[in-house]
């Protein structure tokens, strides 16, 4: 990832999504990322499986966040997608660090290199 600026693009910043669960966020992301060539087949199942095994919710001072991602094999082109849901979406806390987190911002990392 030599050009970090290319990771952040306006086309991958989304506001006011009506999503009640992480699965709904992931399904909407797949609908945006797949047609643009950012993800490979199987991404949706992979991100759900990884989130179940390794939750990504983080309680932060300014805004609670979640940082879902999957294995590099499901990323066709590196990216960072940002979702600001209309209402917070509950994610389990990272590394079992407390209660579930009401994420106000979801930052999906598409990392193609381990």
Language-model features and meaning:
Residues 1-114:
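Cytosolic covalent-transfer regions centered on His/Cys nucleophiles
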């Amino acid at each position: 990832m030599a050009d970090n600026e290319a990771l952040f693009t306006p086309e991958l910043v989304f506001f006011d999504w009506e999503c009640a669960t992480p699965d709904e966020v992931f399904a909407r992301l797949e609908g945006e990322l797949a047609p643009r060539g950012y993800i490979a087949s199987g991404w949706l199942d992979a991100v759900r499986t990884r989130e179940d095994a390794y939750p990504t919710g983080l309680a932060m001072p300014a805004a609670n966040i979640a940082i879902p991602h999957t294995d590099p094999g499901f990323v066709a082109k590196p990216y960072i997608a940002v979702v600001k849901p209309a209402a917070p979406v509950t994610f389990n806390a990272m590394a079992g660090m407390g209660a579930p987190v009401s994420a106000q911002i979801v930052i999906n990392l598409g990392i193609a290199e381990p």
